[in-house]
Design a protein with these regions (language model features):
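Non-cytoplasmic
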Residues: 73-74, 150-188
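Transmembrane alpha-helices
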Residues: 25, 109-112, 116, 120, ...
Length: 231
């Protein structure tokens, strides 16, 4: 199996997994908070927040990548200040994780929000009347009930992050060994004569990773559902 892919191809696969995992893990707490706010809170600007969250799904990925570059690039609005403390996103794998997280965030929020909206608010209110604080109500009542949706949202975000191309290549380019992820490596193969075989190998790897993630998500969701029914 090791000889099936070249060292550069393995590097692209490993980098994609690293980027997708970091993008999912870092964005998950923000995804839960945003989904909770959109599902349970009523506040001025709620629809604006909802629109901003889903904007990456509507904008061309290249536009999102350009906005990230103008914001978090070394001369960007925020990036120039981060650069002074040694935090660099542009043309770095961390920037690839940021771009992947931004593009995957809407899918994560939507899945978690639907799960929260499916929870009967009276269950949360009953716990609150017994003296439980809002964080404790969330941890002991809401979170167990939305766990299947949370898992689904995380897997959707991971899959989207694994396949992210447009925003990533615009923001961090495609530097072999540094920012060249699986999709950008496939694209690079397709730009050279005779690169179809290498692209095909990486396509099969991408399919295998996606199927593994989906099967694992389904298994975890069913395991959680069985445990809840047993409880």
């Amino acid at each position: 199996m090791t000889g099936w892919l070249s060292p550069d191809e393995w590097t692209a696969v490993a980098l994609s997994l690293k980027v997708a995992l970091w993008a999912t893990a870092v964005s998950l707490p923000f995804g839960v908070l945003t989904a909770w706010a959109l599902a349970r809170w009523r506040f001025p600007g709620r629809q604006i927040l909802n629109g901003l969250v889903h904007l990456p799904l509507i904008l061309p990925p290249v536009v999102t990548g350009f906005l990230l570059l103008r914001t978090f690039g070394r001369r960007g609005i925020i990036g120039q200040w981060l650069d002074q403390v040694g935090i660099v996103f542009a043309f770095n794998w961390t920037g690839a994780a940021l771009a992947a997280g931004v593009m995957a965030f809407p899918l994560m929020v939507r899945a978690i929000r639907l799960s929260i909206e499916a929870v009967d608010p009276r269950l949360e209110q009953a716990a609150a009347t017994l003296g439980a604080s809002k964080p404790w109500v969330f941890l002991t009542v809401t979170l167990p009930l939305i766990l299947p949706g949370l898992i689904a949202g995380a897997v959707l975000a991971f899959a989207k992050a694994m396949g992210e191309f447009g925003a990533t290549i615009t923001f961090v380019s495609s530097i072999p060994g540094q920012t060249q992820t699986l999709p950008s490596a496939i694209y690079a193969f397709l730009q050279v004569p005779g690169g179809g075989a290498g692209a095909a190998r990486l396509v099969w790897v991408a399919i295998a990773i996606a199927m593994t993630a989906l099967v694992l998500s389904e298994w975890l969701s069913q395991a959680v559902a069985r445990r809840m029914r047993g409880a």
